[in-house]
């Protein structure tokens, strides 16, 4: 089976050695095309062993090409596809901020409510654009939302996306990621655009709670456990924000708002928050500078190592000098303490803190790149989502063609906002 229009000249495509993401059929690398930084998804043809795999791949390429004609600020930009020997190369723009899911789980990053609303609006505007082009994403989740400069969200991964036609307005394929899938998708019921809206509602709940979503196992017919959720909602959460998330997560698809309605609601909420609780300028995208000697990294490590906005790159040399001065001072203090055998508790505490800082592999730099502060291991902060049943694969997504009966035990979401 052939894929036409291979418009990437592979001789001018350079790929770094270490992968930073791995899925069922592909590995993702950082690379360059004619010297410009790009993201490269490398697919071995022999992994596409069945017709369904080719269908999903060709559909993803077709959708990305169609979106390229006009483009949208909240959709990943497609550059092209190439072929060489047994490999296919899917090339997109490189987004250095990592994915939203990992950022939300790391609580050392302060994300004010006005910024959370802005993030939600970015996602909604991108999804509104997709739906206006008759495209369902079908795998909307926080890990498929990349963080660009100035906290701009880019929707990515269109492997399960599908164009909706008048002749075929509904779908029955069970695909996506368990924690974000709507009940009608999991149960094998016909669904349409409203399934994406449910997934968006689950992303909003992650924005609100800044915690992992619990797997919706057989209880509740895959509806939300509202009693458990209530314990995770911060008291300062804007009522309208929580109410919107609950409307998007309505069990009945007909009761969910459209993305056009969602954008309007978030616009109004953003204006209200600025008037009532101005947060000032949004914080800069966090920067993490790695130890220069690192081996092959997982996707979560790499995303953290590459959180470097353009406007802060010029300060990295200054930071390195500051860090060297700190290390030299620490070594001098330690030598003086050893020579004089001073038994001062305060000095010992300071030395211990300094030694801990020296032993860290990473440093988080504040907004002006001038005051490094230590952080714990990247791996301890960012862990992969646990896989659900229902045929989940290594990328946390699942696909199936049949539904399963589930016991039903539902509670009203209104208990959360009354």
Swiss-Prot record:
Any one cellular-component term (Gene Ontology): cytoplasm
Enzyme Commission number, as recorded: 2.7.11.1
Catalytic-site annotation from UniProt: 139 (proton acceptor)
Binding site for ATP: 20-28, 41
Keywords: ATP-binding, Kinase, Nucleotide-binding, Serine/threonine-protein kinase, Transferase
GO MF term set: ATP binding; protein kinase activity; protein serine kinase activity; protein serine/threonine kinase activity
Domain of life: Eukaryota
Residue stretches of biased makeup (Basic residues): 403-418
Listed PROSITE patterns: PROTEIN_KINASE_DOM, PROTEIN_KINASE_ST
Keyword Nucleotide-binding on entry: yes
Record domain Protein kinase: where: 14-271
Keyword ATP-binding in annotation: yes
Region feature Disordered, mapped onto this chain: 327-356, 377-418
Name used for this protein in its record: Probable serine/threonine-protein kinase DDB_G0280461
Lineage of the species this protein comes from: Eukaryota, Amoebozoa, Evosea, Eumycetozoa, Dictyostelia
């Amino acid at each position: 089976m052939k894929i036409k229009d291979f418009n990437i000249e592979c001789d001018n495509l350079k790929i770094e050695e270490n992968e930073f993401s791995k899925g069922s059929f592909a590995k993702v690398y950082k690379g360059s095309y004619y010297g410009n930084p790009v993201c490269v998804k490398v697919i071995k043809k022999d992994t596409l062993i069945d017709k369904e795999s080719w269908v999903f791949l060709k559909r993803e390429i077709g959708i990305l090409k169609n979106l390229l004609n006009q483009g949208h600020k909240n959709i990943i930009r497609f550059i092209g596809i190439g072929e060489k020997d047994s490999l296919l190369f899917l090339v997109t723009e490189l987004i250095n901020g990592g994915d939203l899911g990992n950022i939300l789980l790391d609580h050392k990053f302060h994300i004010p409510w006005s910024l959370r609303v802005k993030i939600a609006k970015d996602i909604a505007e991108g999804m509104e654009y997709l739906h206006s082009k008759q495209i369902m994403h079908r795998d909307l989740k926080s890990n498929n939302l990349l963080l660009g400069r100035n906290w701009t969200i880019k929707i990515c991964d269109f492997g399960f996306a599908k164009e909706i036609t008048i002749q075929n307005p509904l779908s029955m394929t069970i695909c996506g990621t368990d924690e974000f899938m709507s009940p009608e998708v999991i149960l094998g019921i016909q669904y349409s655009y409203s399934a994406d809206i449910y997934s968006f509602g689950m992303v909003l709940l992650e924005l609100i709670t800044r915690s992992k979503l619990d797997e919706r196992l057989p209880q509740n017919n895959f509806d939300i456990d509202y009693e458990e959720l209530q314990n995770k909602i911060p008291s300062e959460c804007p009522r309208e924000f929580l109410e919107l998330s609950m409307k998007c997560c309505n069990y009945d698809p007909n009761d969910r708002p459209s993305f056009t309605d969602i954008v309007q609601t978030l616009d109004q909420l953003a204006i209200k928050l600025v008037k009532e609780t101005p947060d000032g300028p949004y914080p800069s995208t966090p920067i993490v500078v790695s130890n220069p000697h690192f081996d092959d990294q997982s996707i979560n490590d790499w995303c953290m190592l590459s959180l470097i906005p353009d406007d802060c790159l010029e300060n990295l040399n200054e930071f390195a000098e500051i860090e060297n001065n700190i290390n030299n001072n620490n070594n001098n203090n330690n030598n003086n303490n050893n020579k004089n055998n001073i038994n001062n508790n305060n000095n010992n505490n300071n030395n211990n803190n300094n030694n801990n800082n020296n032993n860290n592999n990473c440093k988080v730099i504040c907004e002006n790149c001038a005051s490094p502060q230590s952080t714990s291991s990247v791996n301890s902060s960012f862990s992969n989502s646990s896989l659900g049943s229902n045929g989940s694969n290594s990328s946390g997504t699942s696909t199936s063609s049949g539904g399963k009966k589930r016991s039903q035990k539902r509670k009203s979401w209104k208990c959360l906002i009354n």
